[in-house]
Structure formats: C-alpha cells, structure tokens
UniProtKB/Swiss-Prot annotation:
InterPro entries: Ribosomal_uL10, Ribosomal_uL10-like_sf, Ribosomal_uL10_bac, Ribosomal_uL10_bac_type. This is Large ribosomal subunit protein uL10. Forms part of the ribosomal stalk, playing a central role in the interaction of the ribosome with GTP-bound translation factors. It comes from the Bacteria. NCBIfam families: PRK00099.1-1. It comes from Psychrobacter cryohalolentis (strain ATCC BAA-1226 / DSM 17306 / VKM B-2378 / K5).
Length: 175
C-alpha cells in the first residue's frame, strides 16, 4: 500500500526528529529476517535506548537533510533498517552487532558517528565504545589516580620511619 503525501511528510518529520537528537546511527540490511525476529530486535533496542526505523531510502534521505547523518544519504541502497543511538554513542552499534552474531541475515551497511560515515567493518569498534556512565567512571578514576598516589607516597614516609625505629629497637634488644 502506497503512502499518501501527508503520511510521507509525517514519516520524514519523525525520522528527522529522531536523527536530530541521536548520537550515532547504523544502517543494516534486514532482508531475510522474519517478523518475530525483527520484533525481538525492536524489544532489545528499546531496552538499550535505541530507536529502530524501517523507512524507504528516499524518505530517509530527505529526513537526514540538515542533520549530522546527511553524509549517509548517498550510500544508502537496498532495504535498510535504521538504528539510532539516543543515550550514548555505541548503543545502536551494540544492539545491531549483538543481534547480527546470531542472525547472519542482518548485514550492516553503514555506521555514522559524529557526522562521519564508516563502513561495516567499524561496527564492532563502535559497539565497544563505553556507555556514558562507563566513560564518567573511567574519567573519575583517571582524575583520582594522582591524588591516590600522593596520599600513598605521603603515608609511606612515616611508615618507613616507624619501621626503621622498630628495627633499631629490635637490634638493641637483641644485642
């Protein structure tokens, strides 16, 4: 069933809004995956803060105009499933990568992060990017390390002094 002009405009507006707020996007060819498996993929995506859209490429190209995913437009061919990361950079890549391990029919075509389009070979690398919480904890650990080392160094001096005095005392008692 063909979409009316109003329906097409609504689809373009929805995808454009999602793309404007997304951190990254993954385009994957889904040909050969059944409805039940796609439904399972959608459930997994929702849990991870990923929005999945199946849209005609011409409508997706219009929706991407003026967004950081505009560079994907000229490389979109075939029936594509678009996954948008709404919470962190790697969430869409993580969902698609994990799902494609078990379902070889889901074939990644494009990965876009920060306006740069990568090929399917970069999907695993993007999927391993830390989540926002993980990145914050890594940053905090890095910032905390010099202070921790300083405290350990400052505690080492009195500790060495006490051990030296104890060794002298033990040596005098033994003599």
């Amino acid at each position: 069933m063909a979409l009316t002009l109003e329906q097409k405009q609504q689809v373009v507006a929805e995808v454009s809004e999602v793309a404007a707020n997304a951190y990254s996007a993954v385009a994957a060819e889904y040909h050969g995956i059944g409805v039940a498996k796609l439904t399972k993929l959608r459930e997994q995506a929702r849990e991870k803060g990923v929005v999945l859209k199946v849209v005609k490429n011409t409508l997706a190209k219009r929706a991407f105009e003026g967004t950081k995913f505009e560079s994907m437009s000229d490389r979109m061919t075939g029936p594509l499933l678009l996954a948008f990361s709404m919470e962190d950079l790697g969430s869409a890549a993580r969902v698609i990568f994990d799902f494609s391990k078990d379902h070889k029919a889901l074939e990644t075509k494009l990965v876009s992060v920060g306006g740069v389009v990568y090929g399917p070979e970069e999907l695993e690398r993007v999927s391993k990017l830390p989540t926002r919480d993980e990145a914050i904890s890594i940053l905090m650990a890095t910032m905390n390390a010099p202070v921790t080392k300083l405290v350990q160094t400052m505690n080492a001096v009195p500790g060495k002094f006490v051990r030296t005095v104890a060794a002298i005392k033990d040596a005098k008692e033994a003599a």
